[in-house]
Amino acid sequence: MFGADKGTADRLDGKKLHIGIVQARFNSGITNALAAACCAELLALGVQDKHIMQVQVPGALEIPVALQAMAERNHYDALIALGCIIRGQTYHFELVANESGAGVTRLALDYQIPIANAIITVENLEQAIARQSEKGADAARVAVEMANLLDALS
């Protein structure tokens, strides 16, 4: 299977950016890998370690409220949501996936702050493992690119 062509920005520069990360602890093996890949990519893009604030919440449904608290402080240039929702035998998967995603999007629009949504939704653990590193790094690139874009538009 071929991956989607995501395109790449010319040059991403995170040197002056402050980034907030909210990571769900549920499925921590996956979310820890997402966070590690995300932070490594932020550093590679020039974001200073001291300008990265990372917090953890119990699960994906709690991510939006922590993002909101960060957005209200008006200290961050971009935020990143990290989580992993694996389909189970109940409707709960759809509820958590839909509500966490809607919350992240609403906050980005309400606060006019870029939020890279790397709350991955998968059918099984194998899919989560296959996506964890790539999606974490993708989230970092999205956050830096969108922070720079919104700065240029203001």
Curated annotation (Swiss-Prot):
(2S)-2-hydroxy-3-oxobutyl phosphate binds at residues 89-90, 131. GO terms for biological process: riboflavin biosynthetic process. InterPro entries: LS (IPR034964), LS/RS (IPR002180), LS/RS_sf (IPR036467). One of its GO terms (cellular component) is cytosol. Pfam families: DMRL_synthase (PF00885). Keywords: Riboflavin biosynthesis, Transferase. NCBIfam families: lumazine-synth (TIGR00114). HAMAP family: Lumazine_synth. Catalyzes the formation of 6,7-dimethyl-8-ribityllumazine by condensation of 5-amino-6-(D-ribitylamino)uracil with 3,4-dihydroxy-2-butanone 4-phosphate. This is the penultimate step in the biosynthesis of riboflavin. This is 6,7-dimethyl-8-ribityllumazine synthase.
